[in-house]
């Protein structure tokens, strides 16, 4: 076994850390992250983006996360009698890989010679976490855990303890898949080759990529640049369409909220359409069920 505990851990955001393949980077490498695009991660790892200092709000989120880990760890212990759980994170690396790598696990569970991983995640609620009611772990988080299982060698079923701000905690189980792990490693090797060849991924329409392009060009030098006519026409058309769509969507949200009153969930028969959730301060947010197909409710008389 070529896995070992790392005693001199690289700090997240440091130049050393940026060069490592870590669990948090796996979803972006695979193109399944809901938060960071392939384009954004590539330029971060290539060193093309200036590091951003941790803001007060972000630090507060980190502090909250650390506090939650303590409570979630105790909850996991109650639900897994006979098992021990490490107090704090443990980082591993696999020296069998030809590239720098790390897997930092929130908790190392042990019972005798048995070992398994216990991860802790926070979210406002199950919907924000990504559970559509099926009880399945979102693909990006599942990929992270499979990477952790591969690097640590702890291939027993892992747990993710979800600690929502609203509702009770929930424990998910992630089964190890050697086939998926091999596919992830192959994708990582292809990713590293693109970095070595200075070949970034193509642009996409994610917020992450949009913000990255803005950060890549922070200066204004006064030059004039010629746009492709098709690109220019598409851009101006989309701007006009966006104004109309935004206005229409706002009106429809208003009507849905008005019908809902103080209700939590809006449905058609038994199909969930939208949910009212607590927002910032005293505000209320309306979350749509994006997985609902409008075609399935056409012609239904509610």
Region spans (language model):
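Accessory terminal regions of nucleic-acid processing enzymes
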Residues: 1-302
């Amino acid at each position: 076994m070529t896995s070992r505990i790392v005693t001199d851990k690289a700090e997240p955001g440091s130049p050393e850390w940026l060069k490592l393949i870590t669990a948090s980077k796996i979803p972006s490498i695979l193109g399944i992250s809901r938060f960071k695009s392939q384009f954004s991660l590539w330029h971060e790892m290539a060193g093309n983006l200036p590091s951003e200092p941790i803001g007060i709000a972000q630090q507060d989120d980190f502090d909250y996360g650390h506090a939650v880990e303590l409570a979630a760890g105790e909850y996991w212990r109650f639900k897994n009698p006979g098992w021990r759980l490490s107090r704090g994170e443990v980082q591993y690396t696999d020296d069998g890989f030809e590239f720098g790598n790390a897997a930092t696990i929130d908790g190392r569970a042990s019972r005798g010679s048995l070992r398994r991983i216990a991860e802790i995640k926070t979210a406002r609620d199950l919907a924000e976490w990504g559970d559509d009611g099926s009880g399945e772990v979102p693909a990006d988080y599942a990929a992270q855990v499979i990477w952790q299982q591969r690097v640590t060698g702890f291939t027993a079923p892992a747990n993710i303890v979800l600690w929502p701000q609203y509702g009770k905690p929930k424990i998910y189980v992630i089964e190890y898949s050697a086939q998926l792990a091999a596919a992830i490693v192959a994708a990582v090797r292809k990713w590293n080759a693109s970095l070595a060849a200075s070949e970034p991924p193509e642009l996409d329409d994610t917020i992450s990529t949009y913000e990255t392009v803005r950060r890549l060009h922070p200066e204004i030098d006064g030059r004039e640049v010629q746009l492709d006519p098709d690109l220019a026409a598409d851009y101006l058309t989309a701007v006009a369409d966006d104004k109309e769509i935004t206005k229409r969507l706002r009106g429809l949200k208003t009507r849905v909220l008005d019908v809902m009153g103080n209700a939590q969930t809006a449905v058609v028969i038994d199909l969930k359409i939208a949910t009212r959730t607590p927002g910032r301060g005293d505000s209320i947010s309306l979350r749509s069920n994006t997985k609902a197909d409008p075609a399935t409710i056409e012609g239904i008389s509610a």
